[in-house]
Structure formats: C-alpha cells, structure tokens
Curated annotation (Swiss-Prot):
Mainly expressed in root nodules, but barely in leaves, roots, stems, flowers and fruits. One of its GO terms (biological process) is nodulation. Keywords: Heme, Iron, Metal-binding, Nodulation, Oxygen transport, Transport. It comes from Lotus japonicus (Lotus corniculatus var. japonicus). Homodimer when ferric. The gene is GLB3-1. Induction: Induced by ethylene and polyamines (PA) but repressed by gibberellic acid (GA) in roots. Repressed by cytokinins (CK, an equimolar mixture of kinetin and 6-benzyl-aminopurine) in nodules. Down-regulated under cold stress in seedlings roots. GO terms for molecular function: heme binding; metal ion binding; oxygen binding; oxygen carrier activity. InterPro entries: GlbO/GLB3-like, Globin-like_sf, Globin/Proto, Hemoglobin_trunc. Hemoglobin-like protein that exhibits an unusual concentration-independent binding of O(2) and CO. Required for general plant development and during nodulation. May promote shoot organogenesis from root explants. This is Group 2 truncated hemoglobin 3-1. Heme b binds at residue 98. PANTHER family: TWO-ON-TWO HEMOGLOBIN-3. The lineage of its organism: Eukaryota, Viridiplantae, Streptophyta, Embryophyta, Tracheophyta. Belongs to the truncated hemoglobin family. Group II subfamily.
Length: 168
C-alpha cells in the first residue's frame, strides 16, 4: 500500500520535498501574524461567496469566523509560530478533522482555487513564500483526500465471517 504522503504527491503533482520546503524558513517570523489572519480572512470570504452551490454547501454548517480562526491558528503554528491551534483545539489531526466533510478531488481543487486567489492577492507575501505556501497547500489538500479515501475504504471492508462491513 502506498503511503499517504506518496499518494498526496502523486495526486497533487507536488513532491514531498517541495511541499515541506515551508520548513526551510520560519514563515511565521518572515510574514507575521497579521499576514496569516488576512490570508485566512481573504480565503474564507471567497469560500463563503463561492457561486458553486455544491462547494458552498460544504461550509453551510460552519461558522465563518471560527473557520478563519482555526485556519490562521493552524497556519501560524505550522509555519513556525506559537502553537495557537493546539493550545485551543488539540492536535491538528487534519484527516480526522475533515472527515465529516465531502473532501473529494473536485472539492480539493475548488479549495485550492480560492487559496491560490487569496495567496496571489496578498501583497504581504513575497513570491518565494507564495510558491512554498501553495506547494504545501496543494500537497496537504491531497493528503487529506487520500486519508479520507483510505478511511472510507477501510470502513467498508467486510470483516471475516461478518454479515455486514466492519466499522473500523
């Protein structure tokens, strides 16, 4: 079985080494807290204004302000800043936290479309950091897709001598 990282690289087109180039520089120190707050706000404004009903509905039961806070706190922590997300919410556990949502290839691409626009319109992010961030986002989006697909496959696997699928 392929690792989730390998599958994420295959589907995203981003090598793991490029996805984790974000670790070569402390992007939190370089860009600052406000940049991540602005990026997350810009991103979620785009998501909540999305004209595609199927995509917009994914977020229908989520509070926009909480989504913004969750994202910027995660990004601050992942990009080298203080562990804001973990202090408030515990381990990020990206796959588990996204399991309730229909995170498909199509949804990942739509999510990435909005993130690319948010990154591109941020004057506070230099070009090199934009590339690193988008490589990370693209790889991570498909890491989540792969993880959810794997969990769904395992959930449906029949148990030996059982009349119905096991619940793993």
């Amino acid at each position: 079985m392929q690792s989730l990282q390998h599958k994420a690289s295959e589907w995203s087109g981003v090598l793991t080494s490029n996805a984790f180039a974000i670790d070569d520089t402390n992007l939190f120190e370089k860009l600052g807290l406000q940049t991540f707050i602005s990026l997350s706000t810009n991103f979620y404004n785009r998501v909540y204004d999305d004209e595609e009903e199927w995509f917009h509905l994914i977020f229908a039961n989520s509070d926009k302000q909480i989504a913004i806070q969750n994202q910027y706190e995660f990004l601050v922590q992942r990009m080298g800043g203080p562990p804001l997300y973990s202090q408030r919410r515990g381990h990020p556990a990206l796959i588990a936290r996204h399991r309730a949502f229909p995170v498909t290839h199509e949804a990942a691409e739509r999510w990435l479309h909005h993130m690319q626009q948010a990154v591109d319109t941020s004057s506070d992010i230099d070009d090199d950091s934009k590339i690193k961030l988008m490589n990370f986002f693209r790889h991570t989006a498909y890491f989540i897709v792969a993880g959810i697909e794997l969990k769904n496959q395992n959930f449906q696997m029949p148990c030996k001598n059982a009349p119905s699928p096991c619940k793993n």
